[in-house]
């Protein structure tokens, strides 16, 4: 299917009468199968007028001289055609051009013009330029257009478009933890503009250009990451085109969020962008509220024609109410009203996160480019209130007090070299780099006296009851952890022929960490043993493309995960090496209008740390901190991605994921996990579907509507059972659920309005953290966005 061409039209005027008498010509250019063609340049030689068709293939000439004219239509990939047009005085002449493709040249044109998501070359993860169809693993990209269409205000709403990626927990309302392929991505797998960021906050989406999700192992590029996949948020950059955009969102529960985006050139070599937003909202949960301020300024300097420097800032200030949901009684979620908040009314939290990054891109020549990237991030989160909702069998709960503070700084440096070269008929696409991170984290522990605030019954909680006064907490301990990371890697995508490609890479990683704890009462500092880990992370992928629209692939990669604890010889534990295998197929149909990706995977951790059965002298071990790398987990599954733009204005996305993650080998000693048990918080099935359509013609042109559906299957909350535990069963079964969202919108000139009703069936379910933070999902809500382009 042809979407964008540059054509050359020659217009020959046969008659010319009465120069002062004019009319109007309105027209549309479509392909032989009825699709509008944008970007067509139309020239009228007699009047020296030219115009370009818009996205709908439409054009308009005003004040055109009256008379009969012959138009010759000619362009690469089309048969030459002629048409006669008569322009009458003060009248509008409506015409439609249907261009027939030239079969001799059409084949090549389709490849260049109609690009499917599988074939579109993307610069992903801050520099890796590659077509998804050439990658031996799964990649999904959610662009700003989809984010805007779906009115996403949280990253958790964006990832609803990605199969197998879901919110595993939302502990206390402070953050959202994302899971993929049975693994928690939150600790090390979340990036922004290619830099690892702290996952202790809820990221802002107002500045996002796209969200990239690379499924499977990414240790080759990033070192220590969980094997389920990595997520990278890419923010919008400065533009040398001047413009601005104001967006105001209002919705249920007093939600209000204006966002302003302004950009443009300062001169021929400097451009800027400033994105800012403010959010203020209450919640379907009584007392709970949130207030956020966000700033994202950026400047780009064109030092030379081949050199750019981008400086970007990112700042978020988030005031929020800690909310641990409803809690559980035994093996069941407590049946408390969805709106009931069980915490103290004075509970509060604050998160401040700021980043400054500098990125230098230098093009050495047409085939090679060099990137220098540097970033410093500061993170500060503090909250206090009642926590951990764990009532007894009749609902009585002694509300415990808690106060926590975390201060973190991450300094990151990256150097990447990317280029292409050939050896004979073999093409190489190389991506190599060196990276280093230094993370300093301080965790402050506070104590209350007494530790219990009061006692309530969760089924009969009255907000009007007078609460005890807010107690003061004393800082008792500060634990500081310093972690240094260094890695060097190289990757080569080798094109052996048009049908065969090989992706080979290797990374060496070094990681060093140490903790020291200051006990404030006696002013004593205890320093832990220094932990050092090194690991090689290889990657090998084979790609077979029997046709230009089919790609069969298989791959092997591994990753490493540092462990805590010591060996029986009082040494630090080695990192666990985790192996991952994938096979799959990527297929385009109907000239790229429909793309499908199917992936099968298996992830094996044969070095799972578990309590050692015996000590070095052969005696029975009772210290759970003494461990061996003798356990095993297996995660295996299937993922299906579907994407289609069957007609102009219609976008359809769908996905399905199956995952089975269990303990495949355990020691059986007291405290070890039970062999064959499924890991908690890992649903077997997830699915997603979205459809968005904008009318292209007629009186209702630019009217749009959409539907979004997301399914999370049955899963287990609580904790996994262990051998020798005193409690019969620590797991809590959680049912699956489906959520539907509907939206409708209209665009008129520079103004657009879009309204979304989310969770239209008012489904009730929960995101779960262990057994004490059961947070209900939001009920039916309405959100309206008003947007104006300057």
Regions found by a protein language model. Name each.
Residues 356-379, 400-516, 597:
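Face-selective signature of the C-terminal outer-membrane beta-barrel domain
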Residues 207-209, 220-297, 303-307, 354, ...:
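Outer-membrane beta-barrel translocator/receptor signature
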Residues 606, 652, 710-727, 745-790:
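C-terminal beta-signal and adjacent terminal beta-strands/loops
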Residues 304, 408, 427-429, 435-439, ...:
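Structural signature of Gram-negative outer-membrane beta-barrels, strongest in the C-terminal barrel
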Residues 35-38, 43-48, 62, 76, ...:
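Acidic, small-polar-rich N-terminal luminal/periplasmic segments of exported/outer-membrane proteins
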Residues 363-365, 369-375, 379-385, 551, ...:
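Membrane-embedded beta-barrel scaffold of Gram-negative outer-membrane proteins
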Residues 628-720, 785-789:
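Gram-negative outer-membrane beta-barrel transporters
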Residues 279, 283, 296-363, 376-408, ...:
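Acidic/polar loop-and-plug regions of large Gram-negative outer-membrane beta-barrel proteins
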């Amino acid at each position: 299917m042809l979407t964008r061409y540059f054509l050359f039209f020659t217009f020959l005027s046969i008659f010319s009468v009465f120069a002062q008498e004019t009319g109007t010509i309105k027209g549309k250019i479509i392909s032989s199968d009825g699709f509008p063609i944008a970007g067509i340049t139309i020239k009228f030689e007699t009047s020296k007028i030219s115009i370009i068709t818009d996205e709908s293939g439409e054009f308009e000439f005003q004040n055109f001289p009256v008379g009969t004219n012959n138009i010759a239509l000619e362009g690469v990939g089309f048969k030459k055609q002629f048409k006669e047009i008569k322009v009458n005085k003060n009248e509008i002449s409506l015409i439609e051009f249907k261009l027939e493709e030239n079969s001799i040249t059409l084949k090549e044109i389709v490849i260049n013009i109609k690009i499917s998501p599988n074939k579109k070359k993307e610069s992903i993860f801050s520099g890796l330029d590659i077509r998804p169809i050439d990658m031996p693993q799964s990649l999904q990209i959610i662009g700003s257009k989809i984010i805007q269409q779906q009115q996403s205000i949280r990253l958790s709403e964006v990832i609803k478009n990605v199969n197998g990626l879901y919110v595993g927990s939302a502990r206390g309302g402070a953050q959202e933890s994302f899971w993929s392929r049975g693994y928690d991505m939150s600790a090390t797998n979340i990036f922004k503009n290619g830099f690892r960021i702290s996952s202790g906050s809820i990221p802002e989406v107002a500045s996002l250009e796209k969200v990239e999700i690379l499924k499977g192992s990414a240790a080759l590029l990033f070192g220590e990451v969980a094997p389920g996949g990595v997520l990278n948020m890419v923010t919008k950059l400065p533009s040398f085109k001047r413009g601005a955009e104001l967006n105001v969102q209002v919705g249920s529960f007093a939600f209000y969020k204006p966002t302003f985006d302004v950009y443009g050139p300062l001169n021929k070599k400097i451009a800027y962008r400033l994105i800012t937003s403010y959010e203020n909202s209450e919640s379907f949960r009584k007392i709970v509220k949130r207030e956020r301020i966000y700033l994202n300024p950026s400047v780009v300097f064109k030092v030379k024609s081949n050199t750019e420097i981008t400086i970007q800032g990112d700042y978020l200030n988030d005031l929020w109410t800690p909310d641990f949901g409803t809690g559980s009684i035994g093996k069941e979620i407590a049946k408390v009203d969805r709106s009931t908040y069980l915490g103290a009314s004075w509970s509060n939290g604050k998160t401040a996160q700021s980043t400054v990054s500098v990125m230098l891109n230098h093009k050495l020549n047409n085939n090679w480019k060099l990137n220098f990237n540097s970033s410093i991030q500061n993170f500060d989160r503090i909250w206090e209130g009642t926590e951990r909702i764990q009532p007894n069998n009749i609902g009585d709960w002694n509300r415990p007090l808690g106060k926590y503070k975390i201060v973190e700084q991450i300094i990151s440096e990256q150097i990447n070299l990317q280029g292409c070269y050939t050896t004979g008929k073999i093409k190489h696409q190389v991506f190599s780099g060196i990276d280093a991170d230094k993370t300093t984290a301080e965790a402050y522990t506070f104590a209350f006296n007494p530790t219990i605030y009061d006692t309530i019954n969760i089924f009969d909680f009255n907000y009007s009851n007078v609460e005890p006064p807010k107690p003061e907490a004393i800082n008792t301990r500060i634990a500081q952890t310093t972690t240094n990371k260094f890695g060097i890697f190289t990757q080569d995508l080798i094109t052996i022929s048009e049908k065969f490609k090989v992706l080979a890479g290797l990374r060496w990683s070094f990681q060093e960490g140490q903790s020291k704890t200051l006990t404030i009462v006696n002013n004593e500092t205890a320093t832990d043993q220094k932990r050092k880990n090194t690991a090689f992370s290889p990657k090998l992928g084979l790609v077979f493309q029997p046709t230009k629209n089919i790609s069969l692939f298989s791959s092997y990669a591994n990753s490493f995960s540092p462990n805590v604890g010591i060996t029986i010889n009082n040494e630090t534990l080695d990192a666990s090496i985790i192996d991952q295998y994938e096979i799959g197929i990527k297929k385009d149909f109907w000239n790229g209008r429909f793309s499908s990706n199917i992936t099968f995977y298996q992830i094996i951790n044969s070095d799972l740390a578990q309590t050692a059965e015996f000590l070095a002298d052969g005696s029975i071990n009772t210290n759970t901190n003494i461990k061996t790398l003798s356990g095993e987990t297996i995660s295996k599954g299937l993922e299906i991605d579907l994407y289609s733009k069957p007609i102009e204005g219609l976008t359809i996305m769908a996905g399905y994921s199956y995952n089975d993650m269990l303990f495949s080998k355990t020691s059986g000693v007291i405290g070890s996990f039970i062999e064959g048990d499924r890991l908690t918080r890992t649903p077997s099935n997830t699915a997603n579907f979205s459809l968005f359509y904008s009318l292209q013609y007629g009186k209702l042109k630019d009217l749009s509507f959409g539907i979004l559906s997301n399914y999370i299957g049955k899963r287990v909350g609580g904790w996994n059972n262990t051998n020798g535990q005193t409690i019969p069963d620590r797991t809590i079964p959680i049912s699956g659920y489906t959520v539907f969202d509907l939206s409708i919108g209209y665009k008129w000139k520079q103004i657009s309005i879009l309204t979304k009703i989310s969770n239209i069936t008012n489904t009730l379910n929960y995101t779960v953290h262990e057994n004490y933070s059961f947070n209900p999902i939001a009920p039916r809500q309405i959100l309206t966005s008003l947007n104006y382009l300057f």
